[in-house]
Amino acid sequence: MRYDEHPIPPHEPVFQISIVARMIGLHQQTIRSYERIGLVTPHRTAGNTRLFSHEDIERLRTVTRLVNDLGVNLAGVDVIMRMTHQIEQLQKELEQTRAERDQLRGGTRH
C-alpha cells in the first residue's frame, strides 16, 4: 500500500521501528544500520524514539529493492538516492521556470 492512499500526511512521523520492520520485512537492526549510514533519517521524539513517516517507509522499500533485487551495494544505493533527489529537485525547478516563462509569454501577447 502506498503512502498516498492513507489519510496521514506522507511526511508525518507516526510509525515506530518495530512496526516499520514488520511492514517491510526488515530486521530492526538493518533499519538502524541504514539510518547510521544516512539512507533514512527518521524523526526522533523527546525520548529519542524513532518515528518513521510513510515517505521514510517508501524510501526503505526502495533501498531494499535496490539491495535485494538489483544487487546494489549500500554505497551505490546512497549515490542512486542522492542522484534521484537531485533529479527531482531539477525537475521542480524546470517546471517552475516553464511556468514563469509561460506567464511572461502570456503577458507580452496582450
Model-derived features: where do they sit?
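A short, Lys/Arg-enriched interface patch at domain edges and termini
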Residues: 58-92
